[in-house]
Design a protein with these regions (language model features):
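Beta-edge loop/turn motif
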Residues: 1, 162-166, 170-198, 220, ...
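Walker B catalytic acidic pair
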Residues: 7-9, 38, 180, 197-198
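Conserved interdomain linker/interface between the two RecA-like ATPase lobes of SF2 helicase motors
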Residues: 9, 23-34, 39-115, 142-155
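Catalytic acidic motif of RecA-like/P-loop NTPases
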Residues: 9-13, 151, 184, 200, ...
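Conserved ATPase-coupling elements of RecA-like P-loop NTPase cores
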Residues: 9-22, 45-46, 161, 187-190
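Conserved segment of the helicase C-terminal RecA-like domain
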Residues: 31-32, 189, 193-254, 258, ...
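Conserved C-terminal RecA-like helicase domain
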Residues: 102-176, 204, 209-213
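C-terminal accessory/connector segments of nucleic-acid motor ATPases
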Residues: 160-169, 277-351
């Protein structure tokens, strides 16, 4: 192998999947790499490390120009009304971003009444589906959704269902797609508009605001090169804020002397966002990409499944391959030592 092109390289910093992007850099020092991402941020770490380990000069090529410009808007209307406006103004397909699979699936039901397909499009959907087997509980729901022009897309669906949604979307037969923030690598779903339902996400321990990188990656799905001249990214205000604004407007126009309506509180697992937060995410630079110590189990499991590992061009077997790879790991010295020191324990725990 002389040349390796690595797309979506920002996943190098993913706590679970990052090793899939890290290992080639460590195991193939004599190979030329092209590392690509729209949201890399500061790449000084990689430039210095690659130059040190490979002895080659490293060029950084940057461009902030999008072939399809995006228009951003912060919304204080209800989510349903925002979807209606996008449909009425011809800005479909719309990808509605949820942050759990259940929320995405549950939301799809509510958009059936919008009836976004023409009669001709409904016929085309039925023809495209043909004798496709929706042979599971979620499959029966999905059939109702897609025949109405509404799709669901997330990792919890069977692959055949995800592929069907992608095909119908590519044919222009889905006007609304409810999905999660994970839509990305290897997925080709044409999107005209992206609609964020929120700007915070539970990460397993807490509920932080999205990073600049995550926001940019999701927003970047809007606008289809070759199909659209522009794309739209809308962000909903928190649901309780929208409801409270509506209650205040209703109270202001009412002649009733009833007691003031109590304001609705935010839902659980919530971090506050507003227009200022939205603008910071819209205008912010992506954070730098860093490796993670706690993803070592993934690479160790991968390496020990091989009878022989290749490190620095040499055949290295067993635990030695794991240790040598971890010692070459890009990162601070203390982090590198922590990774290497944990390898023996993880290796031995597999039985």
């Amino acid at each position: 192998v002389d040349l390796v092109v690595v797309d979506e390289f920002h996943y190098y910093g993913d706590p679970q999947r990052g090793w899939a992007w890290q290992v080639p850099l460590l195991e193939l020092p004599d190979v030329q790499f092209v590392l690509m991402s729209a949201t890399l941020g500061d790449v000084g770490l990689f430039r210095r490390d690659l130059e040190t380990r490979t002895g080659r000069s490293v060029s950084v090529v940057r461009s902030a120009q999008r072939p399809v410009p995006l228009h951003f808007e912060y919304r204080t209307s209800t989510l349903h009304h925002s979807v209606e406006q996008l449909l009425e103004s011809g800005r479909a397909p719309i990808y509605i971003v949820h942050f759990t699979q259940k929320d995405a699936t549950d939301a799809a039901q509510g958009y059936l009444a919008l009836d976004p397909l023409t009669k001709d499009e409904k016929v085309r959907v039925r023809e495209a589906i043909g004798d496709f087997r929706f042979d599971s509980p979620i499959g029966k729901d999905l059939k109702r959704f897609v025949t109405a022009g509404v799709g669901v897309h997330h990792a919890g669906l069977l692959p055949k269902y995800r592929l069907l949604v992608e095909k119908l979307a590519q044919d222009g037969l889905l006007k609304i797609i409810c999905g999660t923030d994970t839509l990305g690598v290897g997925v080709n779903v044409p999107i005209r508009s992206v609609l964020f339902t929120q700007l915070c996400k539970y990460d397993g321990t807490s509920v932080p605001i999205l990073s600049n990188r995550d926001f940019a990656q999701i927003a970047g799905r809007a606008g289809r090169k070759g199909f659209d001249t522009e794309g739209d990214v809308w962000v909903q205000a928190p649901e309780h804020v929208v409801e409270n604004l509506r209650a205040e407007e209703k109270e202001a126009t009412s002649n009733s002397r009833k007691k003031r309506v109590k304001k609705k509180a935010p839902e659980r697992n919530y971090a506050h966002w507003d227009q200022n937060v939205f603008e910071k995410l819209r205008d912010g630079e992506p954070e730098g990409v860093h490796s993670h110590q706690h993803d070592k189990n993934h690479v160790i499991d991968c390496l020990r499944s091989r009878e022989v590992g290749i490190v620095d061009g040499e055949r290295v077997e067993g635990c030695a391959a794991v240790r040598r790879l971890l010692e070459a790991h890009v990162g601070a010295g203390a982090r590198r030592r922590g990774l290497s020191g944990g390898a023996g324990g993880v290796w031995g725990s597999g039985g």
